[in-house]
């Protein structure tokens, strides 16, 4: 599943990708049959560009979910916002601390 996400993300977003991080239960190793695969894609681009990609990224997540019979959640964020939120929001701190870098 993660390799499919990386391939699709690189095809769509190529040089804009800063990092791809697997986070949540699959990254921690405490997943079960009901768990989804949580992946954050951090981009070096503007918020406007991210908005333009959201619909296609949602399609990618749906396609991979259906093909693998598992829910795939893809979260897009720009690098600047991610770094700003790191200092104040525990969610982003957890992603960085517990996450597994898949790319970048």
Regions found by a protein language model. Name each.
Residues 37-42:
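Short beta-strand->loop micro-motif that forms the acidic, two-metal-ion catalytic signature
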